[in-house]
């Protein structure tokens, strides 16, 4: 069994562990560093599933904006919701707390449109809730794309290729 995880065995069979791979020629490197002295732009690119934990970030923005003003944090969600569950976890929060200005739903984007969104971004949002699916160790493609674009990023799972690197932040693998 070949896996992107660190599991030695799966279903009783020994594994061959590899890292997920990307084609660097297909991924555009971010060209400049944005001025973050007045605002911060986060980007999450995915077919949005519950394990991405984007609802955790939106709840964090609710708490942030209830306690702070003056420094704006924007969350650009790029991709479609996989199911109603994900929509129902995120969209009502945005509406209830008037976050439409700060949580921007772009839908699916590719090519130059996606590259332009990455140019605006200051940090990538990886999976923030892999614990919901029982996965603790995984080497996701999205983390590799953020790194290839030269974008710092945050995630909650264990990814042995990136642990301890200066350009990543780790979120707790829980519901905080």
Where are the predicted features?
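Conserved donor-binding/catalytic core segment of Leloir-type glycosyltransferases
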Residues: 34-61, 75-76
């Amino acid at each position: 069994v070949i896996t992107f995880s660190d599991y030695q065995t799966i279903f009783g069979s020994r594994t061959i562990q590899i890292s997920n791979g990307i084609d660097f020629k297909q991924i555009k490197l971010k060209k400049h560093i944005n001025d973050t002295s007045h605002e911060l732009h986060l980007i999450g690119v995915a077919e949005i599933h519950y394990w991405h934990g984007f609802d955790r970030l939106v709840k964090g923005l609710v708490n942030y904006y209830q306690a702070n003003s003056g420094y704006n944090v924007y969350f650009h969600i790029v991709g479609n919701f996989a199911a109603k569950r994900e929509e129902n976890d995120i969209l009502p929060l945005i509406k209830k707390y008037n976050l439409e200005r700060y949580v921007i739903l772009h839908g699916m984007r590719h090519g130059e449109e996606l590259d332009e969104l990455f140019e605006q971004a200051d940090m990538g949002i990886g999976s923030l809730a892999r614990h919901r699916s029982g996965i603790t160790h995984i080497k996701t493609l999205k983390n590799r794309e953020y790194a290839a674009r030269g974008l710092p990023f945050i995630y909650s799972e264990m990814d042995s290729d990136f642990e301890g690197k200066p350009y990543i932040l780790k979120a707790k693998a829980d519901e905080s």
